[in-house]
């Protein structure tokens, strides 16, 4: 008979992957290979991970790259490299995965892990763009233009995932084309993630808070029911 801990871990690995938005390493995309028709013109990415990062990784495990959940297809702890296959659709709907460069890495949450950030699915909801990035004292102010499709989910002191990093929204300014959110980055975040390499104009992957998603759905469903009553 399996212990409860084993059952929970198997359940998570078989059915879904969850993350917390706490980056566990910074890697680098070192090669991209066109898969042609085998994956609808997607690509195979080779990522170099930090030393020791792949020691507990297995084939089929989920790792988030800049907030996008991907499946490990090959790995080598000796060379510190692993590969993932990404479809053309995913490349179109994300940012920073179509070229060589640094990426934030997070292994999927295990049943006994701490939930240090907030619940993150690894499904990118949209791409935002950096409008301002400036160091102020010992911290950094990061402003991101979010598309109008995501604006209704963003609120003061709410959670947002930017390139896989769980962050808190400090300000929200509504705009005609969406909204601009302001984030404060502490030195630890800048040092231990790839966010420090961003600059004005950079595209970033955004994932809204899961709770906000369900609240909006319940409210819209309630309004629809009233309209049809």
What are these model-derived regions, one by one?
Residues 14-229:
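Conserved loop->alpha-helix
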Residues 1-17:
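N-terminal amphipathic/basic-hydrophobic helices that include classical n-h-c signal peptides
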